[in-house]
From Swiss-Prot:
Sorted UniProt keywords: Antibiotic resistance, Hydrolase, Metal-binding, Periplasm, Signal, Zinc
Biological role: Confers resistance to the different beta-lactams antibiotics (penicillin, cephalosporin and carbapenem) via the hydrolysis of the beta-lactam ring.
Cofactor requirements of the protein: Zn(2+)
GO molecular function: beta-lactamase activity; zinc ion binding
A Pfam family that the UniProt record links to this protein: Lactamase_B
Top EC class, one word: hydrolase
Protein name according to UniProt: Metallo-beta-lactamase type 2
EC number, as in UniProt: 3.5.2.6
Length: 249
């Protein structure tokens, strides 16, 4: 127990060095995570409860790469305005990590402002069936990107929160963007599972653990992302859900 407390304290102290930006903007909270990588957080309401949605953007020598989007189209312009105000650069690439609005909802907007937009073919198929705006470019489940001097990788670990959820790995920064397949450490349950594959979720998380064991930071898709026990907590939540399901049958 003391060991766990000590580890949590070390992580908390390390994260206090994060530089906060955009506090004056009520639509988006931006925090510098590492080097040129920033976490942005927006807020929306689901089933009467307010939640935070987290994603990241990377400032490169060519422009800004945005993973996912603010949660709610009313925040799109203020978000990109804030980026330009802080960095003097425009968004040149947007990548959606699955088909839900808090991830793919900005594809049309980013395309209109001149950014190249990307999703997996699986996400594109879902968006097409739902008659929603789609990315300009699609790729198979895994893809490596090189933008100027920066590199990162999109990886499909398997089904979990949705059939199409992917994660994004920044090797230089050792940062993993878990998206919604990774639950925050303060999550009480698995959240929305209307499109989830709970029986596949555990193996998918194990795939993430094995492939990115060197991650220094894991950014969960919602709520608290600074507590770095989110991967194990996700596994615990899946196990709890499965046990309850067995007990009720």
């Amino acid at each position: 127990m003391l060991k766990k407390i000590k580890i949590s304290l070390i992580l908390a102290l390390g994260l206090t060095s994060l530089q906060a930006f955009g506090q004056e903007n009520p639509d988006v909270k931006i925090e510098k995570l590492k080097d040129n990588l920033y976490v942005y957080t927006t807020y929306n309401t689901f089933n009467g409860t307010k939640y935070a949605a987290n994603a990241v953007y990377l400032v490169t020598d060519k422009g800004v790469v945005v993973i996912d989007c603010p949660w709610g189209e009313d925040k799109f312009k203020s978000f990109t305005d804030e980026i330009y105000k802080k960095h003097g650069k425009k968004v040149i690439i947007n990548i959606a990590t699955h088909s839900h609005d808090d991830r793919a909802g900005g594809l049309e907007y980013f395309g209109k402002i001149g950014a190249k937009t990307y999703s997996t073919k699986m996400t594109d198929s879902i968006l097409a069936k739902e008659n929603k705006p789609r990315a300009q470019y699609t790729f198979d489940n895994n893809k490596s990107f090189k933008v100027g001097k920066s590199e990162f990788q999109v990886y499909y670990p398997g089904k979990g929160h949705t059939a199409d959820n992917v994660v994004v790995w920044f090797p230089k920064e050792k940062v993993l963007v878990g998206g919604c397949i990774i639950k925050s450490a303060d999550s009480k349950d698995l959240g929305y599972i209307g499109e989830a594959y709970v029986n596949d979720w555990t193996q998918s998380v194990h795939n993430i653990q094995q492939k990115f064991s060197g991650a220094q930071y894991v950014v969960a898709g919602h709520d608290d992302w600074k507590d770095q026990t989110s991967i194990q907590h996700t596994l615990d939540l899946i196990s709890e859900y499965q046990q309850k399901q067995k007990a009720s049958n």
